[in-house]
Each structure stands twice: as C-alpha cells, then as structure tokens.
C-alpha cells in the first residue's frame, strides 16, 4: 500500500461529506483512507458507516474511529499510528483533492529514493476568488514549510517517529516540519496541484497574533534573553490586525487579503 490519506474531524458532518466524496472520487486506489473523529454527535459517525460500502466497492481500504481526543493534533497523531501506507497525507474535513486524478498525476512523477517529504501546489479558495499557490516560489524564503500540509506527503516512518507536538495550538505542523528540516530530511517539490482548501477562515488566517507568537517558540526565541523584546514586537505588529479586520467592512477586508495574495483570481 502506497498512501494513507488521513482525515480528522469533530462535529463537521457537511465538511466531512465533502472530503469523503473527494477521496472516493480518486482514480488512484493503491491507498487506504483513515478517519479519526473526535466523538462527534452531529451524525458524522452514521455518515462514515454509510460510506464504508462505497469505499469497499472501490477497492480502497477504509477505517475510522470515533472517540474523544485532545484536539486536532492528537487526532492527527492517532491517524499516523494507524497508518499502514508508505506515505501519509492529511486531508482534513472540508479539504479536497484538486482533481479526481490528483494522486495518479502526482505519483506518476519520479519520487527520489531519499526524499522524506514530497509536496506540490495548492488551490486556495477565498470568498473573493481562487488562486494556485506554487510553493516552489517559496523555497528560498521559507525552506522549512513552504507548503500547506494538505499538499504534502510524508513518509509514515517519519510521522510515527516525530509526531505533532500537542502543546502548540495552531502551528504544530510548522514545528514538525522545522524538526524534520533541522534533522536533514530531504524535501522534493513536484509541480502538480494537490489540494484545495479554504484560505480565508483557517486557524492561521484568523489568528495572526497566535501564529507569530507560537512561531517564536518553534525557533527557540523564547529561550533567548531578547524574547520579551521579540514578543513585544510581535504584539505591536500583529496584535491589532485581527481586531482591525473585524471592524472593517467585508469588502475592504477581502481587498486587503487579495492584495497580499496577488495570484488570486476573481
């Protein structure tokens, strides 16, 4: 088995259905699909049971668990420990593959034998338009995590060893890839669009202050003598952004976000 696609969810039945349909529509079948549900009470478990026969008919191994957990990253770690495939991809509730043949196209490329992380591009969806983020362009500026987790595949052995640090609220993925990069794990870029996800309402987009504050921890700035100054700078630069955006008319907020993402098309 080559790929383990993992979805984590909690009380997000409608978003979950969207992701289930996307995975089920893949023309690539050398994979398993794992869903880790946090004990939902909105009918998500009944939905998962209804899809079991559909995945079986497609020839895709399908397993799910529904139990209380300690949050998103705990669920993602559980999924990794369940995985039997060579590569892990996290496609969480509401996320989708870009095309029905995404996995076929992606894995038709030559994967280097020493690559530990393989990643592609992402279609980001906003209220005001969509656009393709080509992550090759970000490699020089951000060699640690120049992609979103939906568009990358990590060796299962690495995920099971490193795991997500659950002390982070929203940047445990950044921390994990920082550790992988620091330890010399090889990244490989493939010029294919892998995933589509909503870039407007994600945790990082709506929590810029927490994003930067936790980022200081990742880079161990919190252990330096100048940490109070760095923290003050973060608060001065980012502390006002979300409150200000909340007070802005939506058209102005969208225009500002679009200006920062020039690849977005109406």
Regions found by a protein language model. Give the residues of each.
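Short alpha-helix boundary/capping motifs
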Residues: 187, 208, 243-247
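Nucleotide-sugar donor-binding/catalytic module of glycosyltransferases
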Residues: 1-205
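Solvent-exposed, non-transmembrane amphipathic alpha-helical segments
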Residues: 99, 174, 178-179, 214-217, ...
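Membrane-proximal basic amphipathic "stem/tether" segments
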Residues: 220-266
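Catalytic core of nucleotide-sugar-dependent glycosyltransferases
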Residues: 193, 205-229
């Amino acid at each position: 088995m080559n790929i383990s696609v993992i979805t984590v969810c909690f009380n997000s039945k409608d978003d979950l259905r969207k992701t289930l349909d996307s995975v089920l529509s893949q023309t690539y079948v050398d994979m398993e699909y794992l869903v880790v549900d946090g004990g939902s009470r909105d009918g998500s478990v009944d939905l998962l049971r209804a899809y079991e026969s559909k995945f079986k008919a497609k020839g895709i191994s399908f397993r799910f668990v529904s139990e209380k957990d300690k949050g998103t990253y705990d669920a993602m770690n559980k999924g990794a420990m369940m995985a039997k495939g060579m590569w892990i991809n996290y496609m969480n509730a509401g996320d989708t593959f870009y095309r029905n043949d995404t996995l076929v196209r992606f894995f038709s490329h030559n994967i280097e034998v020493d690559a530990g992380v393989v990643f592609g591009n992402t279609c980001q969806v906003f209220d005001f338009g969509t656009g393709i983020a080509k992550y090759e362009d970000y490699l020089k500026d951000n060699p640690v995590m120049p992609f979103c987790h939906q568009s990358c595949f990590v060796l299962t052995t690495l995920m099971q060893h490193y795991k997500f640090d659950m002390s982070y609220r929203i940047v445990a993925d950044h921390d994990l890839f920082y550790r992988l990069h620091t330890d010399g794990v090889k990244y490989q870029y493939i010029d294919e669009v892998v995933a589509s996800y909503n870039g407007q309402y994600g945790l990082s987009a709506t929590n810029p202050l927490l994003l930067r504050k936790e980022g200081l921890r990742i880079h161990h700035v919190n252990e330096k003598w100048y940490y109070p100054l760095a923290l003050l700078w973060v608060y001065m630069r980012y502390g006002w952004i979300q409150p200000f955006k909340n007070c802005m008319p939506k058209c102005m907020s969208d225009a500002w976000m679009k200006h920062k993402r020039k690849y977005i098309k109406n």
